[in-house]
């Protein structure tokens, strides 16, 4: 009986039961050494809000303006999937009605060329190109570790930068 009670007590103290949480929400795990879903969500929302509120898209006609997605360069110590940032941004921009993101896959590009040929039109090039960079700054003082991730984004048109912004997310751990 004692062994059974001890086993029940030990198993009751820890649980491997999984539970669903909101991705990037308040119950998500936070790590200093990793860009978490909450970081991706915060960076994307901040950059999109900054872009849309800046008025940088107002001068482009007709709406929605075509935009291509260039490289998002990873300059962190992690192997990260930059699509976690760029895809959230392009979804929000497409949904805003101000921007239409041009597909970069070969099949879509060939289809666009074919439709232009059949309709005796030229293939229209994107007026905007979105590029970016993610860098990190690491610091440690008296046993406290801190990392700041800097998410930089730019829009260019005809070789000129028409908008740029950055979002910094800093995290600490003892």
Name the predicted role of every residue range.
Residues 33-44, 78-86, 142-146:
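Solvent-exposed, acidic/flexible segments
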Residues 23-35, 65-75:
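Acidic/histidine-rich, surface-exposed loop or edge segments in extracytoplasmic proteins
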Residues 8, 123-127:
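Structured loop/turn residues at beta-strand edges in well-structured enzyme cores
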Residues 14-19, 127-173:
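Amphipathic beta-strand/beta-sheet edge segments enriched in Tyr/Trp
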Residues 45-117, 121-122, 160-164:
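N-terminal segment of the mature soluble domain
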Residues 7-33:
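Bacterial Sec signal peptide processing site at the extreme N-terminus
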């Amino acid at each position: 009986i004692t062994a059974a009670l001890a086993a029940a007590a030990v198993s009751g103290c820890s649980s491997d039961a999984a539970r669903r949480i909101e991705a990037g929400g308040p119950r998500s795990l936070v790590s200093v050494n990793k860009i978490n879903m909450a970081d991706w969500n915060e960076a994307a929302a901040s950059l999109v809000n900054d872009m849309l509120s800046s008025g940088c898209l107002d001068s482009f006609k007709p709406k929605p303006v075509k935009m291509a997605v260039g490289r998002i360069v990873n300059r962190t110590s992690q192997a990260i999937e930059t699509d976690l940032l760029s895809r959230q941004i392009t979804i929000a921009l497409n949904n805003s009605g101000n921007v239409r993101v041009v597909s970069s896959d070969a099949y879509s590009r060939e289809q666009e060329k074919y439709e232009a040929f059949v309709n005796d039109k030229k293939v229209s090039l994107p007026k905007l190109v979105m590029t970016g960079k993610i860098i990190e700054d690491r610091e440690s003082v008296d046993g406290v570790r801190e990392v700041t991730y800097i998410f930089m984004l730019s829009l260019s048109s005809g070789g000129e930068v028409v908008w740029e912004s950055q979002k910094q997310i800093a995290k600490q751990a003892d």
